[in-house]
Amino acid sequence: MREAVIAKVSTQLSEVVGVIERHLEPTLLAVHLYGSAVDGGLKPHSDIDLLVTVTVRLDETTRRALINDLLETSASPGESEILRAVEVTIVVHDDIIPWRYPAKRELQFGEWQRNDILAGIFEPATIDIDLAILLTKAREHSVALVGPAAEELFDPVPEQDLFEALNETLTLWNSPPDWAGDERNVVLTLSRIWYSAVTGKIAPKDVAADWAMERLPAQYQPVILEARQAYLGQEDRLASRADQLEEFVHYVKGEITKVVGK
């Protein structure tokens, strides 16, 4: 199953890895494919997720050239018949090994940055709490396209650090403007956080949605059902459930907080 999914995006994947190798090869330690491509299967709007590990920081010339070339290998969901959205996260080996929280991210590329990149705005290296979640994902489910397996290269992320990252993520969503235009993703992400808080594991979005559905009061189930169906390619109508959506967000945040604290 996993090999078949990867085969469907092999051409694009080869192009992306080729760009990475061309710009980073002297310092490149590893490239790991993680996310939907290797866990649960690519859905209509799924990204191709890559974690790249290098030995040294990127100079500004390399950063800009790499990002500009990655832009040519990626497309926003629904805008291309042959290209998927690509998300590339780059870390420096000594910033994450040995593990410490929060860890530093050297670079991240994604379609949400396209307009900024075209305007000449490039995100610098930064502390990223999400690396605790990302590295947990990579250690659980990934394929090494370059270098050793993720579970061999990366230290395990302690559960308390994973919980801290999950808890910090909850602060992003407090009122409707925080999820306007991104309703589906927020609903599914909250379901995944809830799943991870309870189980200590990372699940595909649709699997986490099914898990959450079984635990939700009946009045919130239509919200997650709409999000799941939209994720699988049906029409996204979540914006029409504004009141239910707000109640859902606050309910699930409350359930997560019971587990992870604060």
Swiss-Prot record:
One of its GO terms (molecular function) is adenylyltransferase activity. Changing K8E: In plasmid pBP201. It holds the Pfam family NTP_transf_2. It catalyses: streptomycin + ATP = 3''-O-adenylylstreptomycin + diphosphate; spectinomycin + ATP = 9-O-adenylylspectinomycin + diphosphate. One of its GO terms (biological process) is response to antibiotic. Its EC number is 2.7.7.47. Keywords: Antibiotic resistance, ATP-binding, Nucleotide-binding, Nucleotidyltransferase, Plasmid, Transferase, Transposable element. It comes from the Bacteria. InterPro entries: AadA/Aad9 (IPR024172), AadA_C (IPR025184), NT_sf (IPR043519), Polymerase_NTP_transf_dom (IPR002934). The keyword Transferase applies. The keyword Nucleotide-binding applies. Mediates bacterial resistance to the antibiotics streptomycin and spectinomycin. This is Aminoglycoside (3'') (9) adenylyltransferase. It comes from Klebsiella pneumoniae. The lineage of its organism: Bacteria, Pseudomonadati, Pseudomonadota, Gammaproteobacteria, Enterobacterales.
